[in-house]
Swiss-Prot record:
Top-level taxonomic group: Eukaryota
Protein name: Unknown protein 17
Organism (species): Pseudotsuga menziesii (Douglas-fir)
Length: 15
């Protein structure tokens, strides 16, 4: 699990 790391449905990485 990445802490505070999410990936949007569009494929962009958001920290």
């Amino acid at each position: 699990i990445y802490s505070r790391l999410t990936v949007s449905p569009t494929g962009t990485l958001n920290r």
